[in-house]
Amino acid sequence: MEALVYTFLLVSTLGILFFSIFFREPPKVPTQK
C-alpha cells in the first residue's frame, strides 16, 4: 500500500509541474481543427 501511495504522490507532483509549465508556456504548434 505504501508503494502505491508514494507512486501516486510522485505522479501527482509531476502532473502539477507539467501542467503549470504547459499552461504558463503554451506550445508554438498550430492546432489543426
From Swiss-Prot:
Keywords: Chloroplast, Membrane, Photosynthesis, Photosystem II, Plastid, Thylakoid, Transmembrane, Transmembrane helix. It is a single-pass membrane protein. It comes from the Eukaryota. The keyword Plastid applies. Its main location: plastid. SUPFAM superfamilies: Photosystem II reaction center protein T, PsbT (SSF161029). It is found in: Plastid, Chloroplast thylakoid membrane. It holds the Pfam family PsbT. The keyword Plastid applies. Coiled coil: none annotated. The chain crosses the membrane at residues 3-23. GO terms for biological process: photosynthesis. GO terms for cellular component: chloroplast thylakoid membrane; photosystem II reaction center. Found at the monomer-monomer interface of the photosystem II (PS II) dimer, plays a role in assembly and dimerization of PSII. PSII is a light-driven water plastoquinone oxidoreductase, using light energy to abstract electrons from H(2)O, generating a proton gradient subsequently used for ATP formation. Belongs to the PsbT family. PSII is composed of 1 copy each of membrane proteins PsbA, PsbB, PsbC, PsbD, PsbE, PsbF, PsbH, PsbI, PsbJ, PsbK, PsbL, PsbM, PsbT, PsbY, PsbZ, Psb30/Ycf12, at least 3 peripheral proteins of the oxygen-evolving complex and a large number of cofactors. It forms dimeric complexes. This is Photosystem II reaction center protein T. It comes from Pelargonium hortorum (Common geranium). The gene is psbT.
